[in-house]
């Protein structure tokens, strides 16, 4: 179903009760719990947020099939970069340490000398290195570059600049997504020996929630920001 699930007049508290995975997403916009009965629109007005942008982010997060490229291309580059920067910060500050903590307990509580555990540990380390390297590159090089192009072209949202042809690119698999999928797969298929099932679930649950978040981040990154930048580059030449 390609329809959005959340609309401006809905009570945000009801949406969050049904989809608690949205809590970190609304936190990135400065909206904290204690939502009362306020609608999405009212909360956006109170926080001086663009309701359209918040709703698009929420809906693309909840429904992988829903991805309104044309609409996303009308937002300003700075809005998109601000959101991607905040998701990066969330990975560094919360999600990576969270997986690491669960993984540490899980490994220490399992049978010593279990070969799968070493493999899981190594996979997580390479995933963490890749993700941190990408975030550093984003902060130092990629995002500032996107913003400088956007400033050159003035204050117009990219989608409205005359002559800006945005074509969505087909992309090869993202290494970060692939490493996470492998990590999950190793745990599901190859765990052996004696281990704590509850801790195992905690590790898998934290991996899955990061995976969902990164998939949305990547859709915005590759299908919106990258094509916007290519289009802006052509105009700046």
Feature annotation, model-predicted:
Residues 1-237:
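Small-residue-biased structural context
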């Amino acid at each position: 179903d390609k329809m959005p699930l959340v609309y401006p007049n809905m009570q945000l508290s009801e949406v969050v009760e049904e989809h608690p995975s949205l809590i970190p997403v609304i936190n990135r916009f400065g909206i904290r719990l204690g939502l009362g009965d306020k609608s999405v629109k009212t909360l956006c007005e109170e926080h001086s947020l663009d309701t359209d942008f918040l709703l698009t982010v929420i809906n693309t997060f909840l429904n992988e099939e829903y991805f309104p490229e044309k609409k996303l291309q009308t937002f300003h580059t700075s809005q998109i970069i601000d959101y991607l920067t905040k998701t990066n910060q969330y990975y560094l500050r919360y999600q990576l340490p969270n997986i690491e903590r669960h993984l540490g307990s899980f490994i220490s509580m399992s049978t010593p000398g279990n070969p799968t555990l070493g493999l899981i540990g190594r996979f997580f380390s390479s995933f963490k290195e890749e993700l941190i390297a990408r975030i550093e590159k984003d902060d130092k090089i990629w995002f500032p570059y996107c913003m400088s192009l956007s400033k050159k072209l003035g204050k117009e949202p990219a989608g409205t600049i005359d002559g800006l042809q945005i074509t969505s690119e087909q992309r090869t698999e993202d290494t970060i997504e692939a490493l996470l999928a492998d990590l999950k797969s190793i745990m599901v298929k190859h765990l052996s020996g004696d281990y704590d099932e509850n801790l195992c679930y905690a590790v898998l649950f934290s991996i899955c929630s990061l995976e969902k978040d990164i998939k949305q981040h990547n859709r915005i990154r590759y299908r919106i920001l990258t094509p916007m930048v290519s289009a802006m580059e052509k105009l700046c030449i």
